[in-house]
Amino acid sequence: MSGLIKTAGLQKLAHYKRIVVKIGSALLVEPQTGLRAEWLKSLINDVAKLHQKGVEILLVSSGAIALGRTLLRLPRGALKLEESQACAALGQIELAKTYGDALAQYGLKTGQILLTLLDTEERRRYLNARATINVLLRFGAVPVINENDTVATSEIRYGDNDRLAARVATMMGADLLILLSDIDGLYTKSPHRDPTAEFIPFIASITSDIEKMADVAASELSRGGMKTKLDAGKIANSAGTAMVITSGKRMNPLAAIDRGERRSFFAASEKPVNAWKTWISGHLGPSGILTIDPGAAKALESGKSLLAAGVIAVDGMFHRGDTVAIVDTNGVEIARGLVSYGKNEAVRIMGCKREEIESILGYEARSAMVHRNDMVLRCLTDST
């Protein structure tokens, strides 16, 4: 399959009110020569044209560490954590200046937002970040968002900007998330290694069969690979945000989407979750795991709460109100929610009926281990 394609459900970009565009390091920075200035100018030209048509654009941009590294002329090879953070500090200033100067050519302002994982995982900080970005958009500015790599550690980081972009898209209620990548979409296998790989232009929902393709069709250049892009899609689609994966190697990559260049379109859920459940669903790192029996799994599918009686194993370390993943006996995540008990209590009461819990804990039992109002179901079908 080659040339221009039609993708069911994808409209011209000017029809969307709010779009988040994720830009990877490999697109923005050449290891030897530094910033790809001409490519960035072409992207900003696309952004400016959409902005003139009333579309709000948010840019989630990698590249700070890579740019800082080229500025320091560091040799190839792994960097220590503090070296990466120093590169990020140098590169972030240069990156912000570059975006600011490029957008200024079109009379546009830009505002830099540096986020850590806790800024989207803690409810109050999440709401504050959302309010700040909304004000920037109201002022007509183009927010440029990145992970705050100068302070993020392995324990408190997104790890890739695909999922950060999805979190931003759902937080801001974006209509469309565009992941500009080194690969032009989703394939059944790796197109770099297998000429029989089939391109998939339209994905109605990200099922387990679709996820299996990510293991064999991963990008060879992208840090996150196809798996993190599908993780991003699950976060975005469940909240009502559609997603596009396409090659960012082309000049004017957003205009290329409108021209019909190859891309994969992931449809938004027809029944998006509400804002509260969007926040729950988007949690990237659940604090614990509750394994449940088949009867409990069926109850969740029918919209019931998770009772302690249906829990057969408890893992991780969590407190009341933390986010936990709920998995079946095969280890497949079927839901995610806010737990009503801490780890120690959950271990003591798992498998117990409600009337038994009070005597075990010494106080009146709460209605559920995870209440349905604090729970988001994952895709449970295997069909594509």
UniProtKB/Swiss-Prot annotation:
- Report the catalytic activity: L-glutamate + ATP = L-glutamyl 5-phosphate + ADP
Q: Does the keyword Transferase apply?
A: yes
Question: Which pathway is this protein assigned to?
Answer: Amino-acid biosynthesis; L-proline biosynthesis; L-glutamate 5-semialdehyde from L-glutamate: step 1/2
Which GO cellular component does the record give, naming just one? cytosol
Subcellular localization? Cytoplasm
Q: Which GO terms describe its molecular function?
A: ATP binding; glutamate 5-kinase activity; RNA binding
Q: Which GO terms describe its biological process?
A: L-proline biosynthetic process
E.C. designation(s): 2.7.2.11
**What residues bind substrate, as annotated?**
62, 149, 161
Q: Where along the chain is ATP bound?
A: 22, 181-182
All copies of the PUA domain together span 287-364
What keywords were assigned to this record?
Amino-acid biosynthesis, ATP-binding, Cytoplasm, Kinase, Nucleotide-binding, Proline biosynthesis, Transferase
Provide the top EC class.
Answer: transferase
Has UniProt tagged this entry with the keyword Kinase?
A: yes
What domain of life?
Answer: Bacteria
HAMAP family recorded: ProB
Which family is this sequence assigned to? Belongs to the glutamate 5-kinase family.
Q: What is this protein called?
A: Glutamate 5-kinase
Q: Which organism is it from?
A: Bartonella quintana (strain Toulouse) (Rochalimaea quintana)
Q: Which gene encodes it?
A: proB
